[in-house]
Regions:
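Substrate-recognition/cap helix-loop segment adjacent to the acidic, metal-dependent catalytic center
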Residues: 22, 29-31, 51-59, 82, ...
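Acidic, Mg2+-coordinating phosphoryl-transfer loop and its flanking beta/alpha structural elements
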Residues: 159-182
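Short acidic capping loops at alpha-helix termini that bridge into adjacent secondary structure
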Residues: 36-40, 123-127, 155-159
């Protein structure tokens, strides 16, 4: 029997394509880099920021450091306003919470606490794990395993709702059921 429903964030709880593309393009402009190309735009929604930055820097430590420096002092609010959550997200999550424990397992990092509040989901999740926890990002199973540990639920009694290949791979590696959306 399923006891825990874990959710990815981007592409599952909300549409973040416009927000993520604008976020990375803003950072890249600040460090003199061109905007994301089409392939990078796809990765910008699913991959951790550290992976997107590392791929763009191509081994250039100074460029990578400059990207991280820009993010330390930037205002996230304009990018949060571009997120497209369904109007019924909070009521849906509260209804689900009556029957299951809920968790958020995402490759996002520093934006997670503010994102949860922005979406009106404060107090909804029984466990949250992200790249902010200093674990390997998905497709590694670490983020999902950390959610399981924090929720106190065995993998066989959990399901992960995701929208990408890396979500499916993380779920399989963590030994949890998977529901693909999008």
């Amino acid at each position: 029997m399923i006891e825990l429903v874990m959710f990815d964030a981007d592409g599952v709880l909300f549409d973040s394509t416009e927000s993520n593309v604008a976020y990375y393009n803003w950072i890249f402009a600040k460090v003199g880099e061109p905007p994301l190309d089409r392939d990078e735009e796809v990765k910008a929604v699913s991959y951790a920021a550290s992976e997107v930055f590392a791929a763009r820097a191509g081994g250039d430590a100074a460029k990578l450091g400059a990207m991280h420096d820009v993010t330390r002092n930037m205002d996230q609010a304009p990018f949060f306003r571009m997120l497209r959550p369904p109007l019924e997200l909070r009521p849906f999550m509260l209804e689900l919470k009556q029957r299951y424990k809920l968790a958020l397992a995402t490759n996002r990092s520093a934006t997670v606490p503010a994102l949860v509040e922005h979406l009106g989901l404060g107090g909804v999740f029984d466990a949250v794990a992200s790249a902010l926890d200093q674990v390997r990002p998905k497709p590694a199973p670490d983020i999902l395993r950390l959610c399981l540990q924090r929720a106190g639920i065995d993998a066989a009694r959990a399901v992960y709702v995701g929208d990408s290949r890396i979500d499916r791979e993380a779920a399989a590696s963590a030994g949890v059921h998977f529901i693909g959306v999008g």
